[in-house]
Amino acid sequence: MREYKIAAIPADGIGPEVIAAGLQVLEALEQRSGDFKIHTETFDWGSDYYKKHGVMMPADGLDKLKKFDAIFFGAVGAPDVPDHITLWGLRLPICQGFDQYANVRPTKILPGITPPLRNCGPGDLDWVIVRENSEGEYSGHGGRAHRGLPEEVGTEVAIFTRVGVTRIMRYAFKLAQARPRKLLTVVTKSNAQRHGMVMWDEIAAEVATEFPDVTWDKMLVDAMTVRMTLKPETLDTIVATNLHADILSDLAGALAGSLGVAPTANIDPERRFPSMFEPIHGSAFDITGKGIANPIATFWTAAQMLEHLGERDAAARLMSAVERVTEAGILTPDVGGTANTRQVTEAVCNAIAGSNILKMAAAE
């Protein structure tokens, strides 16, 4: 019996709802597979913890997480706590503290979900966006001076290192090489940002020589938004900076139907530390407690987690179950359905178990 230790951090808003659904699905997979076991410990860190203790997580938070094989994260952010506090107090310290430098965000149109793009079906939009996750625009360097005065100044410094850019570029090329189309698009803004972005272009060309079987091109980030919208079938694997990929991956999720189906993995490729898996969507306080949060993104990122742990069969079984459920029309309101979180979760669990309840659920 293979055993794994998972740290669950539901955090804010709908985070607890979707993480609970994700853990239920993982339990169904355990029962179906019978050859692995997941042991979960839940941490109550987040905005409520901040209101009580003045910090989003304790000072020894990273030390507590080191013993786990992976981290299952919900969402962070609260209306009454500044966003920079919630982000820099919890999610980013984990990503940067554990050197999870590869943020991997797959996107595709799932069966049964109608995307906003005309004449675009499941086979036309199937991407993986690789986001540099350790430096760049989110390096945390900068400052403010003369606060409150007319001459107040704020600086936000983007830092790009040869080591950081090279390793994410190599990761992206390897990923593109492993995918059927072997296509990679490198995204920068090197016409206007003439230092770090030009270095990105140069390093991309250098790393490309190691992967002669990968066809690659480069795009300016503004032009990339147009290409993603008008010519989605021309793209496959995409690599971009921390900020650019953050924005592009949200666009990708929307083009595929909803951020509610968009997953992400924060990976330490060298496996020195636990990697973290989370849905892309935010805490969504507007629907918190209503029971209608879409759990599909959490299920998909659970599949990413299983694959990272080496449980590829279980990951494939989970995604097959998800696609059976969406194709049957069991969908939450954000993707045009009437089902709630519980109904989608139960349908996926039934699909994993091989139950025939799907048709009944779709007809209700």
Curated annotation (Swiss-Prot):
Annotated organism of origin: Agrobacterium vitis
PROSITE patterns in the cross-refs: IDH_IMDH
InterPro entries: ICDH/IPMDH, IsoCit/isopropylmalate_DH_CS, IsoPropMal-DH-like_dom, TTC_DH
Residues that span the membrane, as ranges: none
Protein name in the entry: Probable tartrate dehydrogenase/decarboxylase TtuC
Cofactor(s) annotated in UniProt: Mg(2+); Mn(2+); K(+)
Catalytic reaction(s) noted: tartrate + NAD(+) = 2-hydroxy-3-oxosuccinate + NADH + H(+); (2R,3S)-tartrate + NAD(+) = 2-hydroxy-3-oxosuccinate + NADH + H(+); (2R,3R)-tartrate + NAD(+) = 2-hydroxy-3-oxosuccinate + NADH + H(+); (2R,3R)-tartrate + H(+) = (R)-glycerate + CO2
Function comment: Has multiple catalytic activities. Apart from catalyzing the oxidation of (+)-tartrate to oxaloglycolate, also converts meso-tartrate to D-glycerate and catalyzes the oxidative decarboxylation of D-malate to pyruvate.
Keyword Isomerase belongs to the record: no
Coiled-coil regions, chain positions: none
Disulfide bond annotation, renumbered to this chain: none
Similarity remark: Belongs to the isocitrate and isopropylmalate dehydrogenases family.
